[in-house]
């Protein structure tokens, strides 16, 4: 009996006969030869079947029957295919299979996603099948690499995984963006972020991170928004703002390197410019303040490439502003110290400048915009209470959060990264919907 292997491992079996469980992604050929494009989730590669070889091995009657089975295979039929692995310099993969036998496992009739072009709505309605296509597999392989490296990076840097709840009993920030549900007669909300709970974890464990789904009821229909997405939040006690930025930069560079190392064929499939990714790793990220960014935007707003509206100091950036800023520097760019009025209540003011807060957004170049948001947290109880009172917030909704400042408060901060935005950036794809297996967007909750 031949050894069963995966496609990605065939390089270790050159000259040997192996069996692969796969699906037929495509088929071509005529006369005495048939070409099968095979996939098994690890990679795609080609199998070649020659009619005379089957006749010689099995005799004319059985050999012709088996070859006829191969000729009649339809798209996405599942098979056990046996053959001898050969090197193939013409192939991007570098190897092909000289097919010696085949067994059909599950037939596929009238597969809806054919090689022709299909509209986005059709593909999204058939997302459960679209996932099988070469480019969608590549994006998910990049997502997997990013998740793997996330756990590896934080473990190496002394962080403990901490699981924040998905259901919360209070409306932590903007209640207009919360999904509300009934919790045994009491209103409950799907989490927008695990950050507030993560701060409690940091006071117990020092360095913590969580990774899980979050939900935002934003009625935004853009290429950068999902209503359900995955977030990695990290929180760190006894931390300075510069140390936080250094950690964020090291993390993003580790993610990009991890994708280069773990998913090179996926990047090739997507035709991602890997030299750009290598440059982002090699060069220091740019760091500028919010006010410097506004000055820069105003200075260049009449330039030919300045496709953005005029902003004054105190205004928030839109996507065109973020795109221009990061493209101007050509590397991921931290914009620091935003106005307190447009940021969250818990952010610590810049020393000597209470109108600005110690925070930063990391803007990715090539039009991908914000991928990380982070800040130092206000650790002083009285200052935090004063800020909440100024904003008319109900303190009783935040009793546990305020307790963290009453019992051994310390300087601390953290940041969060939207995994789908990072996947989109690393993969070089245009729309965030392809960065998650089953995207949830405005007007889309199926399949």
UniProtKB/Swiss-Prot annotation:
Task: Read off the InterPro entries from this record.
Answer: Aa-tRNA-synt_II, aa-tRNA-synth_II, aa-tRNA-synth_II/BPL/LPL, Asn-tRNA-ligase, Asp/Asn-tRNA-synth_IIb, NA-bd_OB-fold, NA-bd_OB_tRNA
Instruction: State whether keyword Nucleotide-binding applies.
Output: yes
Localization recorded for this chain is:
Cytoplasm
Gene3D superfamilies recorded for this chain? Bira Bifunctional Protein, Domain 2, Nucleic acid-binding proteins
Q: Which domain of life is it from?
A: Bacteria
* EC number(s) recorded for this UniProt protein: 6.1.1.22
Q: Which UniProt keywords apply?
A: Aminoacyl-tRNA synthetase, ATP-binding, Cytoplasm, Ligase, Nucleotide-binding, Protein biosynthesis
| Biological-process GO terms, alphabetical | asparaginyl-tRNA aminoacylation
Q: Does the keyword Glycoprotein apply?
A: no
Which molecular-function annotations from GO does this UniProt entry contain?
asparagine-tRNA ligase activity; ATP binding; catalytic activity, acting on a protein; nucleic acid binding; transferase activity
Q: Which reaction does it catalyse?
A: tRNA(Asn) + L-asparagine + ATP = L-asparaginyl-tRNA(Asn) + AMP + diphosphate + H(+)
Pfam families, per the entry? tRNA-synt_2, tRNA_anti-codon
One GO term of the cellular component aspect?
Answer: cytoplasm
Q: NCBIfam families per the record?
A: asnS, PRK03932.1
The similarity comment for this entry is:
Belongs to the class-II aminoacyl-tRNA synthetase family.
- How the protein assembles, per its UniProt entry? Homodimer.
This chain belongs to the protein called Asparagine--tRNA ligase
Q: Which organism is it from?
A: Streptococcus pneumoniae serotype 2 (strain D39 / NCTC 7466)
Taxonomic lineage of this organism? Bacteria, Bacillati, Bacillota, Bacilli, Lactobacillales
The gene is asnS
């Amino acid at each position: 009996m031949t050894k069963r292997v995966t496609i990605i491992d065939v390089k270790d079996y050159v000259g040997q006969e192996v069996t692969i469980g796969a699906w037929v992604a495509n088929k071509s050929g005529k006369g005495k030869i048939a070409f099968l494009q095979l996939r098994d989730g690890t990679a795609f590669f080609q199998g070649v079947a020659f009619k005379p070889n089957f006749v010689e091995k099995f005799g004319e009657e059985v050999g012709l029957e088996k070859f006829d089975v191969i000729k009649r295979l339809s798209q996405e039929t599942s098979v056990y295919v046996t053959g001898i692995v050969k090197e193939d310099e013409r192939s991007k993969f570098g190897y092909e299979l000289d097919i010696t036998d085949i067994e059909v496992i599950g037939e596929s009739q009238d597969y809806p996603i054919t090689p022709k072009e299909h509209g986005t709505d059709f593909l999204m309605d058939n997302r459960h099948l679209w996932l099988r296509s070469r480019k969608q597999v590549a994006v998910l392989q990049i997502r997997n690499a990013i998740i793997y490296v996330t756990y590896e990076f934080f473990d190496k840097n002394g962080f403990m995984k901490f699981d924040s709840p998905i259901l919360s009993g209070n409306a932590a920030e903007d209640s207009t963006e919360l999904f509300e549900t009934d919790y045994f007669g009491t209103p409950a909300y799907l989490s927008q972020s695990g950050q507030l709970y993560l701060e409690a974890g940091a006071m117990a464990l020092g360095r913590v991170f969580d990774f899980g789904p979050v939900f935002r009821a934003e009625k935004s229909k853009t290429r950068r928004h999902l209503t359900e997405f995955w977030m990695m939040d990290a929180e760190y006690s006894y931390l300075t703002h510069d140390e936080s930025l250094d950690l964020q930069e090291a993390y993003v560079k580790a993610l990009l390197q991890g994708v280069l190392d773990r998913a090179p064929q996926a990047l090739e499939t997507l035709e991602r410019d890997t030299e750009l990714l290598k440059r982002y790793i090699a060069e220091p990220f740019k760091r500028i303040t919010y006010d410097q960014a506004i000055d820069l935007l105003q200075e260049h707003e009449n330039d030919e490439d300045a496709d953005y509206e005029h902003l004054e100091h105190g205004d928030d950036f839109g996507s065109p502003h973020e795109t221009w800023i990061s493209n101007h520097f050509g590397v991921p760019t931290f914009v620091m110290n935003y106005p307190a009025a447009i940021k969250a209540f818990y952010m610590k003011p810049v020393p000597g400048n209470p109108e600005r807060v110690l925070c930063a957004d990391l803007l990715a170049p090539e039009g991908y915009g914000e991928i990380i948001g982070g800040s130092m947290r206000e650790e002083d109880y009285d200052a935090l209470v004063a800020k909440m009172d100024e904003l008319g917030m109900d303190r009783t909704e935040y009793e546990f959060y305020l307790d963290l400042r009453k019992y051994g408060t310390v300087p601390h901060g953290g940041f969060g990264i939207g995994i789908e935005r990072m996947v989109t950036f690393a993969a070089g794809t245009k729309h965030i919907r392809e960065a998650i297996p089953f995207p949830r967007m405005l007007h889309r909750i199926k399949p």
